Structures are given as C-alpha cells and as structure tokens.
Amino acid sequence: MTIQLRVPQKLVKNGPNEGYIYVKNNAPISLGHVVCWIEWTNKLNNQKKKEKLIFSVSRYSEEKLPIELPTRYCGTMQVEIKQFRIYDAFALFYTELKKLMCETYNILPAGFLSNVHINAQGLTSSLNVLNDKSAIDGVEIADFKLYEYGDNIKNIHWKLSSKMDELIIKQMEQNMQEKILVFFSLQEAQSSIEQYDSMLETLSAVIQSFLKQEKTIEFVWLEKDEQCYSIHTETEFLACLTDLMNKESSTIINTQTFMQQYYSFYTHIICIVDAEVPVFPMENIRFIQYGETSGASLNNVLFTRDNMHRQLGELYL
C-alpha cells in the first residue's frame, strides 16, 4: 500500500481549505475496512484536533480522500497521519502503521483577499523635521533661544548674543528622510490564539496600506534576537509573514527599553503588541494593543477581536 498526504503550503483564512490523502492498493485483494487517524496541531499553543476516516480500497486501485484543513485562525498548522489500520475481510484482525507522515501549512490573514484601507495621511504630515540640539550643519535656522547646558556652542548666534548681553542659540532644523518601523511582539504567555489572529490581521492591513502608498517599511519582531526585514513589495511581506508564523512566540521584553533604542532612528513607529505598554508622550510612536476588554489611553489603541474591523476602519496613523 502507498500512502501520500498533500496539503497546500499556504492558505488564506476562511478560504478554500481542502487537502488530500492518496491511498493506492497494490495488492490483488480489496481492502474493505481501512481506518485512518489524523491529528492537527496549532504551532502557537499546541492545541490539537483529531479526526477518524473509514474507507475501503478496491484491488489495484487508488482512493483520493479529501480532508478539511482548519483555517479559522492565522498561523501555522501541522497535520499528521498518526495511524493506519487495515482490517481483514471480517474486520477481526488488522495490520497497523503508525506516524506515517506529517506536513505543515500556513494560514494567511484574510486581509490578503480584502481591500482594507487605513488612513495613513497623518504619517506624512507630522514629524517632517528633526530638531537636534547638537546639529552643526542644519538646513536652516528654525528659531532662537537662550543658551542651556548641553547646547552646541557652535550654534551660538554671536551678533544677537552681543546685543542682548546673553548667549543666544540658533535652533537648527535638519530634514529627516521618512522612515517607518512596524514592530510586532507577542509577549504574554497566556495570549490566546484569538489575540494572535487579530494581531496578524492588523499587521497585514497596516503594512499593505503602506505598500499601496509606495512606502518602504522596516519590520521587526523579537524572539531571542531581533528579526528585522526591509519590505518594499507584497511578495517580501508575504515571505517575512511566513517566517513570523513559523517561529515560536516572542520572549518577554522591556518595551520601554526597546522604544528608547529605536524611536530616534524612525519618523514613525507602529507597535502591535498583546501586553500592557507604558505611555510614550511622543508623536511618532503609536501602539495598537490587544486585550480582552476595549479601551484607549493617550496614543494607544486597544483592540479586541470583536471591535477589530471597526477599529481598523477608524484608525488614523
């Protein structure tokens, strides 16, 4: 007997989801009673689902058995043929085969098929310049102020200082090229598969909205080490999303420390997280936080699975 398991490597959530088991009987006798046990495992939380198939195979023939692949949530699923029992004609005795084969498949966000649009106009209108106290060669003088400890003495305006008998500092304005960082972190050990699914849907909607505006995005998620991708096209995003879904959940990190390291290098930072985050009074950082109850605080948007689609439609980045 020859047995093959075939599943697509990539499926879209709630889309077509058929896989197949091919069984070929090479013997001169029919197999009237064959039992197959299949097990699915969600790689994020190791939740399992089992199913039993009963069928028959005529002599020198092949059976193509359709199996329905679970696609309710985004993520990576493993499907395994755990056991095969081939019974005799009277279903009294059987030959058993165990752990025959295993395949994995990725379930992509439904946003790949829908036209979700997020208003990202705010990203181009805010923070077009970077005020830098240590700037030496600024593009132009933005303002003047009294000298404070730490100001660059090369920016002293000597003519005004001599007139006013006080040190006057030129505040320089330095153009900064737009740089967008999208940060994804699944931190809580108790995070549900529903939260993870909603976060991936949001990630897909945010990045695809940026790509439609022909913006380049740096995408970062944390495991034991930082994983960073530069995304220019939907194909590149699909590749990094596939990598993300095949990884273990992130280690718990200090979000505040991470933001202090990164915020000065990017004009805009979008953080998609599943844990409570500190308040960051900075215009260029936006947190999209997932939880069990809805609410909002300052620059944080708190999503739940129930309000996700409404919140995405109202989100202004």
Question: What does each model-identified segment do?
Answer:
Residues 1-229:
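An amphipathic, basic-hydrophobic helix/alpha-beta surface used to engage anionic
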Residues 204-207, 241-245:
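Generic hydrophobic alpha-helical scaffold/packing signal
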Residues 38, 146, 182, 239-243, ...:
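Charged/polar, solvent-exposed surface patches and flexible loops
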Residues 223-244:
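Short beta-strand-loop
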Residues 178, 194-197, 232-239, 253-257:
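Generic alpha-helical secondary structure signal
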